[in-house]
Amino acid sequence: MWKRWLALALALVAVAWVRAEEELRSKSKICANVFCGAGRECAVTEKGEPTCLCIEQCKPHKRPVCGSNGKTYLNHCELHRDACLTGSKIQVDYDGHCKEKKSVSPSASPVVCYQSNRDELRRRIIQWLEAEIIPDGWFSKGSNYSEILDKYFKNFDNGDSRLDSSEFLKFVEQNETAINITTYPDQENNKLLRGLCVDALIELSDENADWKLSFQEFLKCLNPSFNPPEKKCALEDETYADGAETEVDCNRCVCACGNWVCTAMTCDGKNQKGAQTQTEEEMTRYVQELQKHQETAEKTKRVSTKEI
């Protein structure tokens, strides 16, 4: 009995093998002139027609490649098969495992003195000086606003009849309320902010652009009736208001008191030393370009004002 079952089983195996051979020959014949592309293979439909389907299984040979999607594949076939299955375009970036990419996030904004900071410092200085005004008495002469300014100017001038930024800062530091601008959480940045705002005040009335104030320029800067103009930053034929930001690589530039101020971070790259040098040069050129746009805009504005 068992011999009959064995013979029947062998017969069924033989039939299946013959059919498989026939299907393989038929598939080879039908798909002979069909090209399906990477990640696909030709298959025969129930109607006996050729069609292209995603490869069912790749050969397990190990030759890792890194795809353009940042994923490592066992071999080229697996990469193209994944592209077919997901319907996405994936190319071989390079041979071998994908290297971990260092994420470079934009740096924090640079420490800057905005127009609001500058104007607040100026308001506090004027308030302090006005509090020292002494009206003339019956038998004594008081001190008016100009005389008080003259007194401080002479006290902090080093003898050249000009106040530079360090002398101006020493003058402002005489009043703790005036100098106590605390925009940033740490004292180091707030100290830097004070110096930047002093520079911004000097720029307000520095008519000959020597970064020093004569007494007349000093008087104009702190004149209570003087309204500081709102300056904007220029870039690519556009003007940007105080506080506007733009990014270049991993650095951030901020418009402050009419000037672009940028961070000076170096971005990670494959060649660290070369990447840093290149980035620094690019950053310098970029800031120079920003300032050039600003100078052009200022000249155009002055010409337009004269024509009016």
Swiss-Prot record:
Signal peptide: 1-20
Pfam families: EF-hand_FSTL1, FOLN, Kazal_2, VWF
Modified residues (Phosphoserine): S165
UniProt subcellular location: Secreted
GO cellular component terms attached to this protein's record: endoplasmic reticulum lumen; extracellular exosome; extracellular region; extracellular space
Domain Follistatin-like: 30-53
SUPFAM superfamilies registered for this protein in UniProt: EF-hand, FnI-like domain, Kazal-type serine protease inhibitors
InterPro entries: EF-hand-dom_pair (IPR011992), EF-hand_FSTL1 (IPR057020), EF_hand_dom (IPR002048), Fol_N (IPR003645), Follistatin/Osteonectin_EGF (IPR015369), Kazal_dom (IPR002350), Kazal_dom_sf (IPR036058), Prot_Inhib_GrowthFact_Antg (IPR050653)
Chief location category: secreted
Tissue: Overexpressed in synovial tissues from rheumatoid arthritis.
CDD domains per UniProt: EFh_SPARC_FSTL1, KAZAL_FS
Domain Kazal-like as annotated: residue spans: 48-100
Domain VWFC span(s) in chain numbering: 233-287
GO molecular function, one term: heparin binding
Taxonomy, superkingdom: Eukaryota
Keywords, comma-separated and alphabetical: Disulfide bond, Glycoprotein, Heparin-binding, Phosphoprotein, Repeat, Secreted, Signal
Annotated S-S bridges: C31-C42, C36-C52, C54-C84, C58-C77, C66-C98
Sugar-modified residues: N144, N175, N180
Domain EF-hand: 144-178, 193-228
This protein's record includes keyword Mitochondrion: no
Known role: Secreted glycoprotein that is involved in various physiological processes, such as angiogenesis, regulation of the immune response, cell proliferation and differentiation. Plays a role in the development of the central nervous system, skeletal system, lungs, and ureter. Promotes endothelial cell survival, migration and differentiation into network structures in an AKT-dependent manner. Also promotes survival of cardiac myocytes. Initiates various signaling cascades by activating different receptors on the cell surface such as DIP2A, TLR4 or BMP receptors.
Subunit structure: Homodimer. Interacts with SCN10A. Interacts with DIP2A; DIP2A may act as a cell surface receptor for FSTL1. Interacts with BMP4. Interacts with CD14; this interaction promotes TL4-mediated signaling cascade.
Protein name (record): Follistatin-related protein 1
Organism: Homo sapiens (Human)
